[in-house]
Regions:
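Short aromatic/hydrophobic-glycine micro-motifs
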Residues: 61, 84, 203, 278-279
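ATP/Mg2+-dependent ligation/transfer catalytic cores
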Residues: 144-270, 277
């Protein structure tokens, strides 16, 4: 055990950077490639359906079942062109991470064959088991289920062969079992209060959108070194060991050269950020070794 860290460090220095293939297209061409944004909605949905969906996204207007069926059909047509075979209601439970259950688009046709189908009913709501989430232990068996409901204000996106549908997740009793439900409630309350204030200066203000400022730094740790640190594994924080070198004493200063493995990671992150995270304005325009 006393030599574990030395062996891990030695192994880390021998690792080579991952090979990252740059897309043949320009960044502007694969921007939001795997996101069902408004441009793709306009292309794959009828005009009236597009208007109804954007109204639901912008103003929280309810969607009729027939409109949901049309939206689901358009989403499926776009997704299958990307090679998608499954869909999932994707949410962030109170137990951290993400939760998802992948279902295929296939249905029996009643004649011994199969057909690909994705209806508005499957898009809008599902009833997964909520037993493994903080849902209370004293309850009847039928109360173990939860409800996942599509949130039109967040973009649907594709990862690998799966269409990911952002949803909220609540218990049978209506209690929130995810992080998004309270966030949406908070945004609604902040927006309403902000509109009231803005109308003192401009009576025509109808809506105020709140944005979250993301932290700009991230830390990269070799997987082997990470596994050898119980404090990082259990808490995600450094709780033991020597203090880091300060005052730019080494060559890894504020404008230091970016290590090869780190540069490969940044390149891969840039590509995925443009393809997937572009609609929520997460991009990586700068490569910078921030050591301070």
């Amino acid at each position: 055990m006393s030599k574990l860290r030395f062996r891990v460090v030695e192994t880390a220095f021998k690792k080579k950077a991952a090979t990252v293939e740059t897309p043949a297209e320009r960044p502007s061409e694969y921007f939001a490639k795997y996101v069902f944004n408004r441009e793709k909605m306009f292309k794959y949905l009828p005009g009236a359906v597009y208007a109804k969906l954007t109204d639901a996204m912008d103003n929280g207007a309810p969607l009729e079942r027939a409109i949901a069926d049309e939206v689901a059909a358009g989403m499926k047509r776009w997704a299958t062109e990307l090679g998608v075979t499954h869909y999932t209601h994707w949410f962030q439970p109170l137990t951290e991470g993400t939760a998802e259950k992948h279902d295929a688009f296939v249905e029996h046709d009643g004649k011994g064959g199969m057909m690909e189908e994705f209806s508005g009913k499957l898009l809008v709501q599902q009833e997964p088991d909520a037993s493994s989430f903080p849902n209370g232990g004293i309850r009847n068996t039928f109360e173990a289920r939860g409800y996942s409901a599509w949130d039109p204000s967040s973009p649907v996106f594709v990862v690998d062969d799966t269409l990911c549908i952002p949803t909220v997740f609540i218990a049978y009793t209506g209690e929130s079992l995810d992080y998004k439900t309270p966030l949406l409630k908070a945004l609604s309350a902040v927006g309403k209060a902000a509109v009231d204030v803005c109308r003192y200066f401009n009576p025509e203000v109808k809506k105020v959108m709140a944005y979250l400022g993301w932290e700009q730094e991230y830390f990269l740790v070799d997987e082997g070194l990470y596994a050898a640190r119980p404090d990082l594994l259990l808490t995600g924080r450094t709780l033991m060991g020597h203090e880091a070198s300060k005052n730019q004493q080494l060559e890894d200063h504020y404008f230091g050269a970016i290590p090869t493995r780190v540069a490969a990671f940044m390149k891969d992150l840039e590509i995925q950020a443009l393809e997937l995270l572009s609609l929520i304005h997460i991009s990586e325009p700068t490569r910078h070794s921030l050591i301070s």
